[in-house]
């Protein structure tokens, strides 16, 4: 008996020692545990344990192997731009940390898009793993969050390049945009996705990030970083992923909320429910399952059954094992985004909130769209599409206008994402429109370049433009004028210039300021409705500002007679109107050019002709003598009421506003426009016969055509009219000299009187030297005074001694 007791005690001690040894091998909860096996399987039955083996984990490395792995890994320093980027992201988005999951899922979706596109032309692309999924797993015990995709994966070089460096130009642009957004008080969380730096948002919640990736053209590698530096090494376990990428986050202490299943599920539904690939979360649920009974329970139940059914035939079939119902926690992958692609559903079945959520998901914007349209196009090509107008213009909308691709239309063929890199899915002027296009009629297994030349794309583009213009037209007037026109008005004007086939439709969307209202903008339809009887032209005046346009001498009589004038205040406005010959049967008239005429009675006509005859000497003198080289002709004006004169361009010449624009453009490109046909056109000099200056000039010319004062006055009037008409003076010094001469005459000062010369003065000593000399003199005087006092004291002392 004693021997048995001793033997039992030894067994207990051996068992305890074995447990302690296992505990010592186990690794503390550090990043190294990320490379160990998950313990989730211990919570499930055998069948679930098998499913658990599919869970996202980095298998099979013990503590010594992990240490050896880290010692052999190649260390890298982050590029300086990446360090700046990460610091800016962490500092600016620390209050919105949850967006890290959105960015990681978005990157995973991009990787899946790439491998699916490759598989269209390479049948072996999916051989490593035919699944196209995103899987997320929380590991509370180890404080780890895993995000795995079966996308294209990354080679070793791509891990170093994509996760350790970034284009310098892209960094600068991103930093500038972040700064601008912060200064404007706008959200910065959308920028990181737009600039492709969303991966670094992982450091908002993680102390360390581990990326395991397998590309079809390389072995599996592990990338690891603590945000200060990173390392890369070949995975000693070999190919455990098949293909794709696992991102493992070692979460910060304050980020433990992101290990809660409900938190992760809510974030996936909030940000990523419209991702085009299934997203799974490793989740638990309680199920009622059948379990075999213990032998005693089964025997007891069998006895009860035999009491109830005593007469049972002996040839009864073989007895089935007894089971009981038990509630059990089961772990499995739960699908988070089981929603059909929104554009594939009938528009009547889609709620407004769903459109808004989809827009935010695919465009990475935080604001709701201003407008959207969901339609199915049929005919030569069938496709489904949803198009959106954003609330605000994308940053840098007109940077290198026309030379940069538009990323805002995503093309799908049979629900397979093809590209967002087409240059002409939309015309340049609609480069702000965002949306998706999905067609079953386009070929799948061709290159992007071949697809871009496909004739059906031109048909799709044509229908997209028509639907976009319909969508814009339906935006409510108040919202259109206050929001859309401020953000995208220039795009519509460029459309009038560039899109000949849709020019009439676009013209109805134009808005301008006018003399009808001091601040509100007006459409051309509204202008035509307000036109005066017998008015056959739409009058417009171009200027650098509304104030300049409405104070121009060209609009004086028009406004006095009650005609409405459109004010063109943007550089592109005059180009736009020039490209639009008419609207609703009414031609446009630039009031700064020839051709402005008013309906006049017979009496008015006779009066005008009499005035023209009266001023004929002055007109001829100006044309043939005083302004011979400066003007084409001089005429009596019908458009001036207050100003003495104006300089009017010919129908084919440049107005003052257009000439300024052309000179500015020429200055930027280094061209000389002085020889340009339009720039070389001479202008017409119009005079106001009722103005006192003009009347007095007529009198003086009749008296003496060679009067130099009158000649100077004519030139000064011409140059003043040049400025008031919006043109630039070629010689401003000569203009200033003439003004000075006219002022001398008006003040009865001799025109040849010279300016008095300033008398020459002897150079004075500087204040600093004088001050220093004064200070030195004072010091010397003080020293001298001190010496005298000392001598007198000595003499006194000697005299006193003599007396004693």
UniProtKB/Swiss-Prot annotation:
**Entry GO MF terms:** ATP binding; ATP hydrolysis activity; ATP-dependent protein folding chaperone; unfolded protein binding
> Where's the motif SRT pseudosubstrate motif?
42-44
Residues engaged in binding ATP: 107, 149, 162, 199
Which InterPro entries does the record match to this protein? HATPase_C_sf, Heat_shock_protein_90_CS, HSP90_C, Hsp90_fam, Hsp90_N, Ribosomal_Su5_D2-typ_SF
UniProt-annotated glycosylation sites, renumbered to this chain: 62, 107, 217, 445, 481, 502
Q: In which tissues is it expressed?
A: Detected in heart muscle (at protein level).
Q: Where is the composition biased (Basic and acidic residues)?
A: 792-804
Which first-to-last residue range defines the signal peptide?
A: 1-21
Which residues are recorded with the post-translational modification N6-succinyllysine?
404, 633
Gene3D superfamilies reported for this sequence = 3.30.230.80, 3.40.50.11260, Heat shock protein 90, C-terminal domain, Histidine kinase-like ATPase, C-terminal domain
Describe how it is modified after translation.
Answer: Phosphorylated by CK2. N-glycosylated cotranslationally at Asn-217 by STT3A-containing OST-A complex: this glycosylation is constitutive. In response to various stress, 5 additional facultative sites (Asn-62, Asn-107, Asn-445, Asn-481 and Asn-502) can be glycosylated post-translationally by STT3B-containing OST-B complex, leading to a hyperglycosylated form that is degraded by the ER-associated degradation (ERAD) pathway. In normal conditions, the OST-A complex together with CCDC134 prevent glycosylation at facultative sites during protein folding, thereby preventing hyperglycosylation.
E.C. designation(s): 3.6.4.-
Q: Name one Pfam family in it.
A: HATPase_c_3
Which Gene Ontology BP annotations are present?
Answer: ERAD pathway; protein folding
Q: List where in the cell it is found.
A: Endoplasmic reticulum lumen; Sarcoplasmic reticulum lumen; Melanosome
Q: Which residues carry this modification: N6-acetyllysine?
A: 479
Chain segments carrying region Disordered: 288-323, 750-804
Does the record's keyword annotation contain tRNA-binding?
Answer: no
- What does the UniProt entry state concerning the protein's domains? The SRT pseudosubstrate motif associates with STT3A during translation in normal conditions, preventing glycosylation of facultative sites until HSP90B1 folding is completed.
The record's section on HAMAP family has:
HSP90
Q: Which family does the similarity line name?
A: Belongs to the heat shock protein 90 family.
Query: What is the protein name stated in its UniProt record?
Result: Endoplasmin
Organism of origin is: Canis lupus familiaris
Q: What is the gene name?
A: HSP90B1
């Amino acid at each position: 008996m004693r021997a048995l007791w001793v033997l039992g005690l030894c067994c207990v001690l051996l068992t305890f020692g074995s447990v302690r040894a296992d505990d010592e091998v186990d690794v503390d909860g550090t990043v190294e545990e990320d490379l160990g096996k998950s313990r989730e399987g211990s919570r499930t039955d055998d069948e679930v344990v098998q499913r658990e083996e599919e869970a996202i984990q980095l298998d099979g490395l013990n503590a010594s192997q992990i240490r050896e792995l880290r010692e052999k890994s190649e260390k890298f320093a982050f590029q300086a731009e990446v360090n700046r980027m990460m610091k800016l992201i962490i500092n600016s988005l620390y209050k919105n940390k949850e967006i890290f999951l959105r960015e990681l899922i978005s990157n995973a979706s991009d990787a899946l898009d790439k491998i699916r596109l490759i598989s269209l032309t390479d049948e072996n692309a999916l051989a490593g793993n035919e699944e196209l999924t995103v899987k997320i797993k929380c590991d509370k015990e180890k404080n780890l969050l895993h995000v795995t995709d079966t996308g294209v994966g990354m080679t070793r070089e791509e891990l170093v390049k994509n996760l350790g460096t970034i284009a310098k130009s892209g960094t600068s642009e991103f930093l500038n945009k972040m700064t601008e957004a912060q200064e404007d008080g706008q959200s910065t969380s959308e920028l990181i996705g737009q600039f492709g730096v969303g991966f670094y948002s992982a450091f908002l919640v993680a102390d360390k990030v581990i990326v395991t990736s397998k590309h079809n053209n390389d072995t599996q590698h592990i990338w690891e970083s603590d945000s200060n530096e990173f390392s890369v090494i070949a995975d000693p376990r070999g190919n455990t992923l098949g293909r794709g990428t696992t991102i493992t986050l070692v979460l910060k202490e304050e980020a433990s909320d992101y290990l809660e299943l409900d938190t992760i599920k809510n974030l996936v539904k909030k940000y990523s429910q419209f991702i085009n690939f299934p997203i799974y979360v490793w989740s638990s649920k309680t199920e009622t399952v059948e379990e075999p009974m213990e032998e005693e329970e089964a025997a007891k139940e069998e006895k009860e059954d035999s009491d109830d059914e005593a007469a049972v035939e002996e040839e009864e079939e073989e007895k089935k094992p007894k089971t009981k119902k038990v509630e059990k926690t089961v772990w499995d992958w739960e699908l988070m985004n089981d929603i059909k692609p929104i554009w594939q559903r009938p528009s009547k079945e889609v709620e407004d909130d769903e459109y808004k959520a989809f827009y935010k998901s695919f465009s990475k914007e935080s604001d709701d769209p201003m407008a959207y349209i969901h339609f199915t196009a049929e005919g030569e090509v069938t496709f489904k599409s949803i198009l959106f107008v954003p609330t605000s213009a994308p940053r840098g909308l007109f940077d290198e206008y026309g030379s940069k691709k538009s990323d805002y239309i995503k093309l799908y063929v049979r629900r397979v994402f093809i590209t967002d890199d087409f240059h002409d899915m939309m015309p340049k002027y609609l480069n702000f429109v965002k949306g998706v296009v999905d067609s079953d009629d386009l070929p799948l297994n061709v290159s992007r370049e071949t697809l871009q030349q496909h004739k059906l794309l031109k048909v799709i583009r044509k229908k997209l433009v028509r639907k976009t213009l319909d969508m814009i037209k339906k935006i409510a007037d108040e919202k259109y004028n206050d929001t859309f026109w401020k953000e995208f008005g220039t795009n519509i004007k460029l459309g009038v210039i560039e899109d000949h086939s849709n020019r009439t439709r676009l013209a109805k969307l134009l808005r301008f300021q006018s003399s009808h209202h001091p601040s509100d903008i007006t459409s051309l339809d509204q202008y035509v409705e307000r036109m005066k009887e017998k008015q056959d032209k739409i009058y417009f005046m171009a200027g650098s500002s509304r104030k300049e346009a409405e104070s121009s001498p060209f609009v004086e009589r028009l406004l006095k007679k009650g005609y409405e004038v459109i004010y063109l205040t943007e550089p592109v406005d005059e180009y736009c109107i020039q490209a639009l010959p008419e609207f609703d049967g009414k031609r446009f008239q630039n009031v700064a050019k020839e051709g402005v005429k008013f309906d006049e009675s017979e009496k008015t006509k006779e009066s005008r002709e009499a005035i023209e005859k009266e001023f004929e000497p002055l007109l001829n003198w100006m044309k043939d003598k005083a302004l011979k080289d400066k003007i084409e002709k001089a005429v009596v004006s019908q458009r001036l009421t207050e100003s003495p004169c104006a300089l009017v361009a010919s129908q084919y010449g440049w107005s003052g506003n257009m000439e300024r624009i052309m000179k500015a453009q020429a200055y930027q490109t280094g061209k000389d426009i002085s020889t340009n046909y339009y720039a070389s056109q001479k202008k017409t000099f119009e005079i106001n016969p009722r103005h006192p200056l003009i009347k007095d000039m007529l009198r003086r010319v009749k008296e003496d055509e060679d009067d130099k004062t009158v000649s100077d006055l004519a030139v000064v009037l011409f140059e003043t009219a040049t400025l008031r008409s919006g043109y630039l003076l070629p010689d401003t010094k000569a203009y200033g000299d003439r003004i000075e001469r006219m002022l001398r005459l008006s003040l009865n000062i001799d025109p040849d009187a010279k300016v008095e010369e300033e008398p020459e003065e002897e150079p004075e000593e500087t204040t600093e030297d004088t001050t220093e000399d004064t200070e030195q003199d004072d010091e010397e005087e003080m020293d001298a005074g001190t010496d005298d006092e000392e001598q007198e004291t000595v003499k006194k002392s000697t005299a006193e001694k003599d007396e004693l």
